[in-house]
Amino acid sequence: MAGQKIRIRLKAYDHEVIDSSARKIVDTVTRTGASVAGPVPLPTEKNVYCVIRSPHKYKDSREHFEMRTHKRLIDIIDPTPKTVDSLMRLDLPAGVDIEIKL
């Protein structure tokens, strides 16, 4: 697989979970002999939802909720077949969304 690059994008609501997952991926890749660029922190996406506190009236009294999506980017340069196999077997937490591009 010479000259190839694997790009991994991670998304999660909890920054501690995504950082530990990125650390696991980087450790696994370096152990198998491929080189790694990252993890690169991408901009955090922040969604704010505004809700009226009262069910009937008092429109001036509102409550704001926000949901933050943390993102990380990892590039694996010149992966070996052993690298790909170990990434397939890697167990990551349920709260992390993984997107892999070859």
UniProtKB/Swiss-Prot annotation:
Q: Which UniProt keywords apply?
A: Ribonucleoprotein, Ribosomal protein
Please tell me whether the keyword Repeat is annotated for this protein. no
**Listed PROSITE patterns:** RIBOSOMAL_S10
Give a yes or no for keyword Ribonucleoprotein in this entry.
yes
Q: Which Gene3D superfamilies match?
A: Ribosomal protein S10 domain
Q: Which residues form a coiled coil?
A: none
Name the GO terms of the biological process aspect. Answer: translation
User: Per its UniProt record, what InterPro entries does this chain match?
Assistant: Ribosomal_uS10 (IPR001848), Ribosomal_uS10_CS (IPR018268), Ribosomal_uS10_dom (IPR027486), Ribosomal_uS10_dom_sf (IPR036838)
- GO molecular-function annotation terms? structural constituent of ribosome; tRNA binding
Its cellular-component GO annotations read:
ribonucleoprotein complex; ribosome
User: What is the similarity comment for this entry?
Assistant: Belongs to the universal ribosomal protein uS10 family.
- Subunit details: Part of the 30S ribosomal subunit.
Q: What does this protein do?
A: Involved in the binding of tRNA to the ribosomes.
Name recorded for this polypeptide: Small ribosomal subunit protein uS10
The organism of origin for this protein: Kineococcus radiotolerans (strain ATCC BAA-149 / DSM 14245 / SRS30216)
